[in-house]
Amino acid sequence: MDLSDFHISTPLRYFHEEASLLWKLGVFAVLVYFLLPKPTYKTNVKVPTVKYMGPWMPEILSRIFFNSHAPTVIYKGYEKFKTSAFKVVKPDGDLVVLSTRYAEELRQMPSTTLNALEATFTDHVGGYTTILTDSHLHTETIQKKLTPAIGRLIPRMISELDHAFEVEFPTCDDQFASINPYTVFLRLVARVGARIFIGDELCREEKWLQASIDYTKNIFLTIALMRPMPGFLHPIVGRILPSSRSLKDQLSYIQQDLLGPVIKERRRLEASSDSEYKKPDDFLQWMMDLAQNENESHPDNLSHRLLGITSMAVVHTSAMSMTHILYDLLTMPDLIEPLRDEIRNEIKDWNKATQADLSRLIIMDSFLKESQRLNPPGDLSFHRVVKKDLTLSDGLFLPKGTHICMAAGPISKDPDVVSDPDTFDAFRFVKQRTATSGFVSTGPNNMHFGLGRYACPGRFFAAFVIKLILSRFLMDYDFKFETEHKERPKNLLIGDKIVPNVATPILIKRRATKA
């Protein structure tokens, strides 16, 4: 299979190449809505429904308007019902948004009661984005193998990033050069992720890098285009949407031509009598070793899980975070020198940095958390599907099948929770230094990584990747917008999801003093 058949070349194309098709589908959806309004999942929970234009607004219009006005609806609901619960209606179903007063009660409930994987599947249009939800193998591998190994993995991460900085950035010793930051960060993260997740066999193979990056882009393009559609249209849209069709081709290519052969060869060597063979020390091998049954150990499913976890939990989220961070620095350049000073003081030699060195970057850690607070991945978090009828301690009844969540965005900008919430204070969490003030910390007032036993397990690894990239970038480059920007590039809103503008170019120039 020719990889170029499903290559998406630029971020601008990533978000806009199918706009014409989306517009036509949108018109079609509106027409069909009035004829056949059947959301995939509805709920009869007895809580107020919050609508964009008020309670008089017909439900059908509320569903149609949600994708373009989700923040207004969610913030309005939180303002009115932040100590109880409310419902929002989307094109494909209903969400019950619960107050954080339920957090302690819900956070440790088992997956047999509240299922996070099923909620992720629903929220990410899993039937059309190839998301697997039949096992916790990838989560278990992160928790048992990846996170405890971060300290010894950092030298490998540095080695790969050192190579990546040399090959991914243009020559710019004497003059500024233009780059698309999202594209560059995407490739940096993909490279370091590949080194840890699949080892030396494929990590620098362009065919793997491009396939995994394009797979990532197609997942989120498919989500962005399908979420505005009512659920009953998904089977039709999924068949004709180029990004959705490409995902299946990409997955098959990776299973059959890239990872599948690697898995089979590793198993052949394991079964051989070769006493010299030593198992690779990477995420793929850890999953192979932890797999408990035939389904988990099948090469196709191992390939699928590894691709999914790298694409969704490592590459996309880290590249998006890095792009947000860069825009914050470009619009608040007075923060650059304090960050550089801290890097100089705590990391004497970037190429020999340790986990302890990176953990001492408390100003950077606070800055990352503040950037995420004001530019989160979405306004809703703690998504769960209720697997059996559930009555909460105050009597609120949640029937089986209810999709619940919490308003992470409004919570992190609530003046009762955060002082002066509309101000970007890079030192906010340095001054707090509480148990939940760290970038990767979670709690009822800080849920952008989730909450409880199913909070994002890869956040620890991702945080060190981001700190390594940012520390090297800050010390090696000066940077500015390509044109005279006075404001931060506006985020793109896709329903309740928030992404940076990925089409804004910047100029970079190599500094005389490097990491």
Swiss-Prot record:
Where is the secretion signal located?
none
The record's listing under InterPro entries reads: Cyt_P450, Cyt_P450_E_grp-IV, Cyt_P450_sf
Under Enzyme Commission nomenclature, its number is 1.-.-.-
Alphabetized GO MF terms: heme binding; iron ion binding; monooxygenase activity; oxidoreductase activity, acting on paired donors, with incorporation or reduction of molecular oxygen
Location comes to: Membrane
Gene Ontology BP terms = paxilline biosynthetic process
Give the residue spans that cross the bilayer.
Answer: 20-36
What keywords does the record list, in alphabetical order?
A: Heme, Iron, Membrane, Metal-binding, Oxidoreductase, Transmembrane, Transmembrane helix
GO cellular component terms listed in the entry, alphabetical order: membrane
Topology in the lipid bilayer is annotated as: Single-pass membrane protein
Q: What class of enzyme is it?
A: oxidoreductase
- Primary place of residence? membrane
What metabolic or biological pathway is this protein involved in? Secondary metabolite biosynthesis
Q: Does the keyword Oxidoreductase apply?
A: yes
Residues given in the record as heme binding sites: 456
* Cofactors (names): heme
Highest taxon of source: Eukaryota
What happens in the null mutant? Impairs the production of paxillines. Leads to the accumulation of the paspaline intermediate.
User: What exactly does this protein do?
Assistant: Cytochrome P450 monooxygenase; part of the ATM2 gene cluster that mediates the biosynthesis of paxilline, a mycotoxin that acts as an inhibitor of mammalian maxi-K channels. PaxG, the geranylgeranyl diphosphate (GGPP) synthase is proposed to catalyze the first step in paxilline biosynthesis. Condensation of indole-3-glycerol phosphate with GGPP by paxC then forms 3-geranylgeranylindole (3-GGI), followed by epoxidation and cyclization of this intermediate (by paxM and paxB) to form paspaline.
Q: Which family does it belong to?
A: Belongs to the cytochrome P450 family.
Q: What is this protein called?
A: Cytochrome P450 monooxygenase paxP
Origin species, per record, is Penicillium paxilli
Name of encoding gene: paxP
